[in-house]
Amino acid sequence: MLESPPTSRDPGYPRLLGDVGGTNARWAWQAGPGDGPTHVRTLPAAEHASSAECIAAYLRTEGLGEPRRAAFGIATAVTGDRVQMTNHPWSFSITELQRTLGVQHLRVLNDF
């Protein structure tokens, strides 16, 4: 039996992708399955009071809607729900950020 490939209407898309460091937050957008990242932009972390504000600025600047899912690496250990950056003042709850973004799923990983 042949299956058709998923479409951009896949419920897990679009996705917000990121790499967050103490100096910069790099964001990108994945519109659908198999699509490469687009709307790649680097924002200075110091210009934003929180990760949520930085993400909102990215989405607004790029003219993007709400992502369905999000994932980003961050320059600190992720051992539970509360994330505290060691080289920047941002601190957040993964659960609260997921709710704020309105995403179905949020994955935050230590980027080593």
Per-range role (PLM):
Residues 2-60:
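Short glycine-rich, Thr/Ser-proximal phosphate-binding strand/loop in the N-terminal lobe
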Residues 62-108, 112:
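Short beta-strand-loop/turn "lid" adjacent to the catalytic site in phosphate-handling enzymes
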